[in-house]
């Protein structure tokens, strides 16, 4: 569950510590991406009707942003040593990348309740955690206080970390020249991929829903 600042002072301190920036439409390419300042834009009633007609006859994705039309002020805090790529899942469940956050910085985002965000290493696409989980869903603000999304490194397995290091040192075309077990060639070539992670998270969500039935 997103961490809320206990008071405005804490919110200000958290923002200063993370080097928070607030991006307007011009800096964020808002007009091109349909973003409101640094966050995605909600659809109006007419657009919703058109979306529903287009979606008729095909299943709606399990993981997608909900068009709640309820604003939520969020601060993305990059507390990892990696350059972070925020990714918003739009209303069709398609990943939409947003401007990167350098280590130790933050950004105020104008998002909405029910929107889905995930975060990746901008260079390697390794998965990162947000508030100790893989998906971030903004809730409503309480007394105008922003929701903090703290982005951190997960505890990678030894194998995962070794694969990351080898990928950083060896070009993909040279993987199979390494004197290692053959199965590791395939592991090295299986680069992190947002779409694959979304498929896995979707299956986990479906399994969890079935267990709850």
UniProtKB/Swiss-Prot annotation:
The gene is VHL. Changing residue 162 to Y: In VHLD; type I. Changing residue 98 to N: No interaction with HIF1A. No HIF1A degradation. Pathway: Protein modification; protein ubiquitination. Sequence repeats lie at residues 14-18, 19-23, 24-28, 29-33, 34-38, 39-43, 44-48, 49-53. Changing residue 175 to D: In VHLD; type I. The lineage of its organism: Eukaryota, Metazoa, Chordata, Craniata, Vertebrata. It comes from Homo sapiens (Human). This is von Hippel-Lindau disease tumor suppressor. One of its GO terms (cellular component) is nucleus. Changing residue 101 to R: In VHLD; type I. Belongs to the VHL family. Residues 1-65 are annotated as: Disordered. Changing residue 170 to D: In VHLD; type II. Changing residue 178 to Q: In VHLD; type II. Changing residue 52 to K: In VHLD; benign; type I. Changing residue 101 to G: In VHLD; type I; requires 2 nucleotide substitutions. Changing residue 76 to L: In VHLD; type I. One of its GO terms (biological process) is cellular response to hypoxia. Changing residue 162 to W: In VHLD; type I-II.
């Amino acid at each position: 569950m997103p961490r809320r600042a206990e008071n405005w002072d804490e919110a200000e301190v958290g923002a200063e510590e993370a080097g928070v920036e607030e991006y307007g439409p011009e800096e964020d390419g808002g007009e091109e991406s349909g973003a409101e300042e640094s966050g995605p834009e909600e659809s109006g009633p007419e657009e919703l009707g058109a979306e529903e007609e287009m979606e008729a006859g095909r299943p709606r994705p399990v993981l997608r942003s909900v068009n709640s039309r309820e604003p939520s002020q969020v601060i993305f805090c990059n507390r990892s040593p990696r350059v972070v790529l925020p990714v918003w899942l739009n209303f069709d469940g398609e990943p939409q990348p947003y401007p990167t956050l350098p280590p130790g910085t933050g950004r105020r985002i104008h998002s909405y309740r029910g929107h889905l965000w995930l975060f990746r290493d901008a260079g390697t696409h390794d998965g990162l955690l947000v508030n100790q989980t893989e998906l971030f869903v903004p809730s409503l603000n309480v007394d105008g206080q922003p929701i903090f999304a703290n982005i951190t490194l997960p505890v990678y397995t030894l194998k995962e970390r070794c694969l990351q290091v080898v990928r950083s040192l060896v070009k993909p075309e040279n993987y199979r020249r390494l004197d290692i077990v053959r199965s590791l060639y395939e592991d090295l070539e299986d680069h992190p991929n947002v779409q694959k992670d979304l498929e896995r998270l979707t299956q986990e969500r479906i399994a969890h829903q079935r267990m709850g039935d």
